């Protein structure tokens, strides 16, 4: 029975949820399914157990699982590979008399197959990894299914279980030397885990290994095995039916379903095992070496690729099987064409998640190379040993030294080449839980004969998986013959032949299986050999012999023999749907481990769920916490041993872990309750719906009967269910599980696993996804579509967005005319083979966003195809048959799931443009390097870690994009002579040495380069911003033709003059955000420089040589310390000059620059844009500014102007005078501004506005907010009225509290002068705090923003400032709610910023969000409660989700053609970012989406970030986007929007969602102001500057917001900005820092040494009397200066900035500096200690140069809990309290201090170590005294005057104590110390910030680990002598016992020891120490060697009765003798 559509009403409360749960359980339309997931899912869904007889015989073997094996399993942690029981396979038994032959298979293949393992020992057990999962899967499941076709019969056999056998001697040797342990399957899980961790090396394949077909021994072994038996044994080993070619029986196929394998199991397979390694290779027959009979010619896997798979989680190992008769088997027949076109079979052995869950996978036909195997003996050649080799572990000997590549040697006995490849360290990946995909099983496809016609004509079924399904199982076709079923199955598996079929067999030729992975070589054919010979050089790089060709064909990577590279991923024919929990192997970096989680919120639910577990894992060792300098080991053999700081490595680990955890979060289904019923809403074709209750295992075919009953459908016919996401619908397979699909889509939409997902299906979720129930009918076109089709031409066919399944019939008649075809956005589209073959002119094909998970097979038949676009799909592999598209020139595979490419790519000789961006490549797809005609490659947004050497073969490549990867090193590219552009942005590159001779454009933004040296002679543009670069130079050759150089956001402290001398052709130079104090004189050489930007540095002056830059047009110098112009600047022809935020004043009037400007100059005529905000200019500068006669834009905001009447500029269009001291505006002056469009006069002292402003007819922006306006608007003859300014778009009166707009009707003009509706263009009207007595105010609408509220909310003052920028529409909405929900302690502040708004009529969605959000939040708070913080956070989160649901519900209606108010079709690609601040009492909750940020500024100079930016380029956001099927291009999600979370964006769902990040803060007295702003503010201003401005205007948030806006515009912002400021406490007053000296309490100095300090409190006057004196010093500064002079210049500037900034905040006086040491005085102990603590914290958070953090004295150190306690420069501090002698320096006018007090303070500082604060006893006593006073105030409730004597002093101290308590402190008694130069010892106390208290423990441990003392040195000598005595006794020495125990020999007396130490230097002591240690090591080594060689240690004695004795007894006897001798001597 159908029901009407729901209205999507919300569930109200937990009680309602429980009722719905009960209804769901009771209303299930299907049978109750109480079976556990772990019991139900692993069973085959074919229901074949109900059938018997021939029906079972037609099917493949079905795998059954023991339900017990997983019934208690909830996560992967509980599944141990070694703890599994053997699993049997139930099958129909048909015994054969030949069964004993099959059982003898292991013994007959003993010499052939097990020899593979012997060979693997030579390659450091790497070949063992070639088995990959195969080895692992057979570890405990000793089974195989056998299907033999013998004598024309098709029979089935039971699985054969092979008994354990006793290993041979050779096998035993192999186990030892290959690193195998004797652990068996019965070992404990703990031992297995240790074994897993013990093997961490993955050896790449030796590319120069000779094929086994050349081995005479191989042929001999092959001949010894009878052909019949070999075929049967091969069937046993491979588990497939192998047919004799002479029988003539059609091949049949086993199609097991692919199952993801757990990574832990894979690692377990890596560990060599004595029983496992041999049996695995035996059971599965997988060739581990290139010398195997199946791997020599068309090897299914190379060593390197299998090694990669060994760490993967879901990859398929394939075996190419070819049947060649014994008479034709020879070493030459393997490559023959006849061998390639015999009847072929295929099998695909799949990895298993764990060893108890075998499953079958779909597979296609493949060929088998029948080259015999070789048996290679153990190599006895010497190898390189590591110094730390464990001699007791024989397996350790075979481990190759990673940096060493052992040269290949020839085995003369067998004629085979063996090589020991370079080792690559591959860390173990994270553990995973069991996914639903891993538990699902599929029935094997039925076997049938391959009929050629049906095979070529079969339909390719477009995969329906929206990357949301579990593993799919193939349903059993009904009513079809075996041949028909077989052919269809084969087509679904995309069988393609390696090349175009000949005429003879074009219809009857059976296409082979497409290449399943990058490592699977293509078929043998002449074209393949030719391309290999042509493109792949050998070791000499000049030719390629036949052996190299054969080796190349068996090696997917196609690398030359000299190449050793990290293996690429296997990409088998498996369905890795996104519900699989497995991860690709290459997700684990060869350099970076994947542990630690990122603080960024990729999925709050998962982070919260695992936070407890993460906290239990310490990052560093307990005994030694600091991290040494890390030497990166690149996969590329050219990678340098570059140093990287531990901080970066830890961050890499966090980023990598985030990726793994995020993928795990969405793909793990282990938390599902298999018995729980989930609600799902399914719609009918008439838009009615019904809600079903299903278990997770319920399939589509099980739901369809229930739906028929629900919808009362009695008609006959087939029905199906489609899934609609966005605008695309995909038909679900009968075996699909809708509940799992629904669940994952909900997670991708922002819901969490902890949410009630089981009842959410009751609601209308059609805005995200929609299940449609409909009959199976052909496509129906709308009239518009039919007209479009009829009108379309037949040459260029456009069939986009038509929901097609096949091309319309009409086009079949014109296929021969089609040249280009576009079928994009048709999710079910299939292009039949007939259509493709008949389109003989087809040149271009676009299949974008068809949501295919498989490569459309038939398109490889379009042999003339030139352009192919398949972006935005889920394609996991490219078939090898793509080689047939030899004419292909353009190939776009962007945004797929590719991990590798097939070897057939080498046939694409004409390929020129290749786009592989936004895929899953872990390793560079090296096969593309042999497409030598490539001109452009895009591999951005992958996870590539290194570039192989073979990249140099792309000699024609002009442009290469590798941005957003994980590259760490770029090596030599000198042979790529045509390379012009190289994009390497956003990688991890620390070193680059390309030597690219013709490279012109190089982009290196956001990498880790600290020193740039490269040879790029033709470089024209270099972008190297956001790198920790401290020096830059060019090796050997300088790029003289360079025109653009960008070095922004680096750490440069100077620019080498030689660099600028060589770059004489430079036109653009950017040096922003560095630490430059000057520019070199050589800048004058840049005579062609046009653009120069040195903003946000520390420049103290403009170099005079700058005046010689005659071509300079734009000069940006804002945010520096420049005080004056330079002579000669008047000769520059600048058009734009920005000197904002400098120290310019009136001094310019005194130099010649002013006089030269007065008489006319080039600058006065050329300058058009002059930005000079935030300086010290005043009215005396008007004559200078008037010289710029052509000035268009003048910005003089925040200067000292008080009168503009002297301004004579008439051509001005934009005038900014905000923040000055203007009180009036001259009418005559205004009349000169006839062209004025923008006038900013806010934050002045204006009382009235002249009437002449009405004459400014072009005025569009007028801001007079935050003034003191008080005038009568009706007096329009004398005061300004806006009636005549019709072009006004922005008008702001906010902040004028005395200004009144009163209704007044003028009879002269018969109009109301207060009417604001007369301004038709008005977009923003600010009337906050303005008195309104008129109704003539326009109503707010979608393109008009009105503010009329007061600037107080809940007693707290707030202010808003905004600007339209260059937009003509409203894009941001702010709203506040006072007394939210009627509660006095609640308020709500919201800021909604639009994205992708319509430029014509504004932004609709942001307005709707503003109007409805508060109501939604109220409902959610009522629903979830507000009793706890968690309840409120949940309500906030669901408020955004519900908001997004309602917004997209409206957009969904628009998309369906409904008429929705204020929304149009254009809004489907628009949305809004939101930041919500909810304050409840003292708790502040911040929730945000997108890039609007909120900052909490504190009065102690600190701040707290409350929000997180959701950008698509952030790795955690990017991973989520990719999992959901989206992509990122140019920093935008799907190329549309630059945020990853937002409300709206209907067309981007589920790639974008609305789950917010939420933070909670408990407000304290230190919290001063809240700043919420759109993203443009943070782009142009740093957070410190924002907080400084907010702190400066803490009492007036409206002025603070306005000043922030004005500064952003002065710094270059031209876009819209909205800023909201909230002062958190009522009656906040600006208070100065006080001292105990009354004279200094009220006075402040006003000199500014740095413009960054200008906004802070002025420096205090020097304190006198009792004061706190602090000395600071940098630890190891001399060493660092000598080691890194350039880096230390940058580091010292950072250090000084922190010191001086904190001094201003806490009120200290800088006495003087000596080098890097500071001497500082404070008037109170509390202020001094607070400053010390805060400086230590700031130093820890500073950005230090890479060189500083790469050494031990500056590296990152973490404590046991993982908290960083040291990083960067380490500063020691000493503080003392006393009364020094003040003395004023007459020259510097600085106060100095003298006397014993100063000396003692300096000595106390000398006691401290780096990071410590040493306090004298006097200071400690004074501090305790003040704290007792504070305790009396707090606990005793005494008044400040009673406690402190004076109230003002008490206020100061109490405020400082509050700051101190907000930081926290920890004191440790350091004991008494003798201070240098002082008589008495001083009791010293060490202080730390509270969060750094663990520093003390580290310092104590570090102190104990320092150099040994004298006593320890001589003790070591005693040990050495005693060990040598033992050696002498063992060797039969003649030294008597009494001589050996004499004190003079064994031990010096104290007198001798003192004499030695006094006579030697420190260097001699170190040499003595080294000598003693060497002696000890030698003795120990000799003793160990003797112990190993003999059964014991024999003491040689002179008497003949000496007996053999153990070494331990000998030692005991010797010690007893020594003791007895001592007793006798005493």
UniProtKB/Swiss-Prot annotation:
Matching PROSITE patterns: GUANYLATE_CYCLASE_2, LRR, PPM_2, RA
Biased composition (Low complexity): 282-300, 575-601
Domain PPM-type phosphatase per the UniProt entry, residue ranges: 1357-1624
LRR repeats: 795-814, 815-838, 842-862, 863-885, 886-908, 910-931, 932-955, 957-976, 977-999, 1001-1016, 1017-1040, 1042-1062, 1063-1086, 1088-1109, 1110-1132, 1134-1156, 1188-1209, 1210-1232, 1233-1256, 1258-1280, 1285-1308, 1319-1344
Activity modulation notes: The presence of GTP-bound RAS2 protein is required in order to elicit a magnesium-dependent adenylyl cyclase activity.
Gene Ontology molecular function terms on file: adenylate cyclase activity; ATP binding; magnesium ion binding
The Guanylate cyclase domain, residue ranges: 1668-1805
One cellular component term from this protein's GO annotations in UniProt: cytosol
Keyword Metal-binding in record: yes
Positions with biased composition (Basic and acidic residues): 32-43, 93-102, 329-350
Positions of post-translational N-acetylserine modification: 2
Class of enzymatic activity (EC top level): lyase
Pfam family, one: PP2C
Family named by the database record: Belongs to the adenylyl cyclase class-3 family.
Chain's role: Plays essential roles in regulation of cellular metabolism by catalyzing the synthesis of a second messenger, cAMP.
Protein name according to UniProt: Adenylate cyclase
Gene symbol of the encoding locus: CYR1
């Amino acid at each position: 029975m159908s029901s009407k559509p729901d209205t999507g009403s919300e569930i109200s409360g937990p009680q309602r949820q429980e009722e719905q749960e009960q209804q769901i359980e009771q209303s299930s339309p299907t049978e109750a399914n109480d079976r556990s997931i772990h019991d139900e899912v692993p069973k085959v869904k074919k229901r074949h157990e109900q059938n018997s007889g021939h029906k079972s015989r037609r099917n493949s073997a079905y795998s059954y699982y023991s339900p017990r094996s997983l019934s208690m399993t909830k996560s992967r942690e509980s599944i141990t590979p070694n703890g599994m029981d053997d699993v049997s396979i139930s099958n129909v038994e048909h015994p054969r008399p030949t069964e004993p032959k099959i059982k003898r298979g292991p013994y007959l293949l003993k010499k052939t197959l097990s020899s593979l393992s012997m060979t693997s020992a030579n390659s450091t057990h790497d070949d063992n990894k070639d088995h990959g999962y195969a080895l692992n899967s057979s570890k405990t499941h000793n089974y195989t299914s056998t299907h033999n076709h013998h004598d024309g019969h098709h029979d089935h056999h039971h699985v054969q279980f092979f008994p354990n056998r006793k290993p041979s001697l050779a096998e035993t040797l192999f186990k030892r030397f290959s690193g195998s342990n004797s652990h068996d399957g019965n070992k404990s899980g703990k031992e297995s885990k240790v074994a897993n961790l013990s093997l961490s090396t993955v050896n790449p394949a030796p590319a120069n290994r000779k094929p086994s077909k050349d081995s005479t021994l191989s042929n001999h072994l092959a001949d010894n095995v009878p052909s019949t038996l070999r075929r049967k044994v091969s069937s046993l080993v491979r588990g497939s039916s192998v047919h004799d070619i002479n029988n003539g029986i059609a091949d049949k196929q086993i199609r097991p379903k692919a199952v993801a394998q757990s990574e832990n199991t894979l690692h377990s397979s890596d560990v060599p095992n004595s029983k496992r390694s041999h049996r695995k290779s035996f059971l599965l027959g997988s060739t581990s070496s290139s010398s195997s009979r199946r791997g020599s010619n068309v090897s299914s896997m190379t060593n390197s690729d299998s090694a990669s798979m060994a760490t993967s989680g879901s990859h398929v190992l394939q075996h190419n099987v070819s049947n060649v008769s014994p008479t034709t088997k020879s070493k030459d027949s393997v490559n023959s064409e006849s061998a390639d076109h015999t009847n072929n079979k295929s099998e695909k052995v799949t990895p298993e998640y764990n060893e108890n869950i075998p499953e079958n996978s779909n597979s296609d036909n493949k060929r088998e190379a029948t080259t015999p195997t070789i048996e290679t003996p153990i190599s006895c050649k010497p190898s390189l040993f590591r110094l730390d080799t464990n001699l007791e572990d024989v397996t350790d000997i075979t481990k190759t030294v990673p940096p060493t590549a052992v040269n290949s040697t020839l085995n003369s006995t067998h004629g085979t080449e063996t090589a020991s490849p370079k080792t690559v360290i591959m860390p173990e990946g994270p553990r995973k839980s069991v996914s639903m995909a891993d538990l699902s099983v599929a029935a094997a496809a039925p076997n049938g004969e391959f009929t050629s016609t049906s095979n070529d004509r079969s339909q390719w079924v477009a995969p329906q998986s929206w990357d949301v399904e579990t593993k799919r199982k193939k349903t059993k076709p009904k009513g079809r013959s075996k041949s028909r079923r077989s052919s269809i199955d084969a087509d679904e598996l995309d069988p393609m032949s390696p090349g175009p079929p000949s005429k003879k067999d074009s219809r009857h030729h059976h296409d082979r299986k497409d290449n399943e992975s990058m490592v699977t070589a293509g078929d043998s054919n002449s074209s393949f050999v030719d391309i290999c010979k042509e493109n792949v050089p050998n070791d000499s790089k000049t030719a390629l012999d036949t052996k190299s060709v054969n080796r190349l064909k068996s090696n997917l990577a196609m690398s030359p023999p000299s190449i050793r590279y990290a293996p690429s991923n296997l990409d088998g024919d498996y369905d890795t749907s996104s519900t699989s929990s497995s991860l690709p192997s290459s997700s684990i970096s060869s350099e970076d481990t994947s542990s630690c989680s990122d603080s960024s919120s990729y999925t709050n639910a998962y982070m919260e769920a695992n936070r407890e577990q993460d906290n239990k894992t310490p990052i560093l060792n307990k005994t030694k916490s600091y991290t040494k300098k890390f030497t990166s080991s690149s996969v590329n053999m050219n990678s340098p041993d570059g140093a990287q700081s531990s901080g970066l490595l830890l961050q890499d680990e966090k980023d990598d872990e985030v990726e793994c955890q995020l993928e795990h979060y969405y793909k793990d289904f282990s938390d599902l309750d298999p018995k729980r019923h989930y609600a799902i809403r399914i719609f009918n074709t008439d838009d009615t719906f019904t809600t079903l209750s299903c278990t997770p295992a319920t399939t589509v075919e099980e739901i369809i009967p229930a739906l028929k009953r629900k919808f009362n459908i009695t008609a006959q016919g087939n029905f199906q269910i489609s899934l609609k996401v966005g605008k695309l619908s995909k038909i679900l397979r009968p075996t699909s599980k809708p509940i799992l699909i629904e669940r994952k889509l909900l997670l991708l939409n922002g819901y969490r696993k902890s949410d009630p997902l089981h009842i959410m299906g009751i609601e209308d979720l059609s805005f995200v996804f929609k299940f449609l129930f409909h009959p199976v009918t052909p496509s129906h076109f709308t009239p518009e579509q039919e007209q479009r089709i009829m009108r379309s031409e037949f040459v260029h066919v456009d069939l986009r967005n038509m929901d097609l399944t096949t091309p319309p019939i009409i086009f079949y008649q014109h296929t021969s005319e089609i040249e280009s075809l576009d079928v994009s956005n048709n999710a079910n589209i299939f292009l039949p083979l007939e259509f493709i073959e008949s389109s003989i002119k087809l040149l271009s094909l676009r299949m974008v966003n068809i949501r295919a998970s498989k490569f459309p097979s038939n398109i490889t038949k379009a042999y003339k195809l030139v352009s192919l676009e398949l972006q935005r799909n889920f394609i996991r592999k490219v078939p090898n048959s793509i080689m047939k598209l030899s004419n292909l020139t353009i190939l776009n595979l962007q945004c797929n799931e590719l991990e590798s490419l097939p070897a057939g790519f080498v046939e694409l000789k004409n390929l020129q443009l290749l786009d592989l961006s936004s895929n899953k490549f872990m390793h560079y797809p090296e096969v593309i390097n042999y497409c030598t005609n490539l001109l452009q490659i895009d591999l951005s947004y992958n996870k590539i870690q290194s570039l192989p050497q073979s990249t140099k073969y792309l000699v024609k490549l002009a442009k290469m994009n590798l941005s957003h990867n994980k590259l760490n090193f770029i090596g030599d590219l000198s042979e790529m002579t045509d390379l012009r552009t190289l994009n390497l942005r956003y990688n991890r590159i620390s070193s680059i040495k390309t030597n690219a001779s013709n490279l012109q454009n190089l982009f290196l933004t956001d990498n880790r380069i600290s020193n740039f040296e490269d040879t790029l002679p033709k470089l024209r543009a270099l972008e190297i911003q956001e790198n920790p670069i401290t020096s830059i130079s060019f090796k050997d050759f300088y790029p003289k033709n360079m025109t653009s150089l960008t070095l922004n956001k680096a750490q440069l402290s100077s620019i080498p003059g030689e660099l600028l001398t060589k770059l004489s052709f430079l036109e653009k130079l950017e040096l922003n955000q560095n630490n430059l104090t000057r520019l070199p004189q050589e800048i004058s050489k840049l005579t062609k420089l046009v653009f120069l930007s040195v903003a946000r540095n520390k420049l103290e002056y403009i170099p005079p040589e700058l005046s010689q830059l005659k071509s300079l047009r734009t000069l940006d110098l804002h945010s520096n310390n420049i005080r004056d112009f330079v002579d000669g600047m008047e000769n520059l022809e600048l058009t734009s000059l920005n000197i904002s935020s400098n120290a310019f004043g009136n001094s310019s009037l005194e130099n010649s620059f002013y006089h030269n400007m007065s008489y006319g100059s080039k600058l006065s005529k050329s300058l058009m844009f002059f930005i000079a905000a935030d300086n010290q200019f005043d009215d005396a500068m008007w004559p200078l500014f008037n010289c710029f006669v052509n000035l268009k834009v003048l910005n003089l905001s925040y200067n000292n102007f008080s009168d503009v009447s002297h301004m004579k500029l008439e051509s001005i269009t934009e005038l900014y005078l905000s923040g000055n001291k203007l009180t009036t505006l001259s009418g005559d002056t205004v009349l000169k501004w006839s062209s004025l469009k923008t006038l900013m006069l806010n934050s002045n002292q204006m009382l009235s506005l002249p009437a002449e402003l009405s004459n400014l007819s072009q005025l569009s922006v007028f801001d007079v907010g935050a003034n003191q306006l008080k005038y009568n608007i009706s007096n329009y003859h004398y005061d300004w009225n806006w009636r005549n300014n019709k072009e006004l778009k922005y008008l702001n009166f906010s902040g004028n509290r005395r200004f009144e707009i009163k209704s007044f009707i003028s009879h002269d003009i018969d109009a109301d002068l207060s009417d604001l509706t007369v301004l038709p263009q008005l977009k923003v009207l600010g009337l906050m705090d303005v008195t309104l007595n008129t109704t003539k105010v326009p109503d707010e609408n979608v393109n008009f923003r009105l503010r009329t509220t007061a600037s107080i909310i809940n007693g707290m003052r707030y202010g808003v400032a905004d600007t339209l920028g260059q937009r003509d529409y409203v894009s941001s909405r702010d709203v506040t709610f006072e007394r939210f929900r009627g509660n006095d302690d609640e308020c709500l502040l919201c800021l909604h910023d639009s994205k992708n708004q319509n430029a014509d009529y504004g932004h609709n969605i942001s307005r709707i969000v503003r109007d409805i959000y508060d109501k939604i939040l109220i409902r959610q708070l009522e629903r979830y409660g507000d009793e706890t913080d968690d309840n409120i956070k949940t309500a906030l989160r669901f408020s955004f989700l519900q908001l997004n649901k309602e917004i997209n519900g409206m957009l969904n209606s628009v998309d369906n053609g409904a008429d929705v108010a204020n929304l149009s079709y254009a809004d489907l690609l628009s949305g809004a970012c939101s930041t919500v601040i909810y304050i409840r009492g003292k708790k502040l909750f911040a929730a945000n989406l997108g890039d609007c940020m909120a900052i909490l500024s504190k009065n102690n100079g600190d701040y707290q970030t409350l929000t997180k930016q959701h950008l698509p380029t952030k790795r955690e956001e990017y991973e989520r986007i990719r999992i959901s099927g989206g992509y990122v291009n140019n920093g935008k999600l799907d190329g549309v929007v630059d945020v990853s979370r937002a409300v709206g964006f209907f067309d981007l769902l589920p790639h974008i969602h609305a789950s917010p990040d939420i933070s909670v803060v408990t407000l304290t007295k230190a919290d001063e102001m809240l700043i919420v702003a759109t993203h443009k503010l943070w782009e142009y201003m740093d957070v410190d500057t924002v907080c400084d401005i907010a702190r400066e205007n803490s009492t007036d948030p409206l002025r603070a917001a306005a000043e922030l806006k004005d500064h952003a515009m002065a710094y270059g912002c031209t876009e819209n900005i909205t800023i909201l400021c909230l002062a958190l406490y009522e009656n906040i007053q600006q208070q100065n820092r006080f001292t105990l000296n009354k004279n200094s309490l009220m006075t402040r100095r006003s000199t500014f040494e740095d413009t960054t300090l200008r906004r802070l409190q002025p420096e205090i006057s020097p304190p006198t009397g009792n004061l706190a004196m602090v000395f600071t010093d940098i630890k190891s500064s001399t060493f660092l200066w000598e080691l890194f002079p350039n880096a230390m210049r940058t580091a010292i500037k950072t250090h000084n900035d922190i010191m001086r900034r904190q001094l201003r905040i806490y009120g200290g006086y800088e006495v003087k500096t000596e080098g890097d040491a500071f001497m500082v005085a404070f008037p109170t102990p509390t202020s001094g200690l607070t400053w010390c603590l805060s400086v230590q914290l700031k130093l820890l958070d500073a950005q230090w140069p890479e060189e500083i953090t790469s050494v031990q004295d500056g590296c990152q150190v973490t404590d046991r809990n993982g908290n960083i306690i040291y990083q960067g420069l380490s500063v020691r501090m000493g503080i003392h309290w006393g009364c020094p002698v003040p003395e004023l320096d007459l020259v510097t006018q600085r106060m100095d201090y003298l006397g014993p007090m100063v000396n003692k303070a300096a000595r106390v500082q000398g006691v401290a170590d780096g990071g410590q604060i040493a306090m004298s006893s006097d200071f400690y006593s004074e501090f305790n005294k003040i704290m007792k006073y504070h305790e009396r105030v707090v606990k005793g409730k005494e008044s400040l005057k009673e406690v402190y004597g004076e109230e003002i002093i008490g206020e100061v101290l109490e405020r400082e104590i509050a700051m101190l308590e907000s930081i926290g402190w920890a004191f440790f008694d350091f004991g008494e110390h003798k201070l240098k130069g002082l008589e008495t010892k001083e009791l010293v106390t060490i202080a730390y910030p509270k969060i750094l208290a663990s520093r003390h423990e580290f310092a104590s441990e570090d102190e104990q680990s320092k150099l040994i003392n004298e006593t320890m040195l001589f003790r070591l000598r005693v040990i050495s002598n005693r060990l040598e005595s033992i050696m002498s006794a063992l060797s039969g020495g003649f030294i008597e016992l009494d001589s050996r125990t004499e004190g003079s020999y064994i031990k010096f007396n104290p007198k001798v020891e003192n004499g030695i130490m006094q006579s030697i230097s420190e260097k001699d002591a170190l040499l003595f120490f080294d000598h003693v240690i060497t002696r000890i090591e030698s003795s120990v080594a000799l003793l160990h060697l003797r112990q190993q060689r003999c059964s014991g240690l024999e003491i040689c004695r002179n008497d003949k009765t000496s007996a053999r004795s153990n070494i331990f007894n000998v030692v005991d006897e010797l010690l007893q003798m020594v003791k007895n001798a001592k007793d006798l001597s005493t």
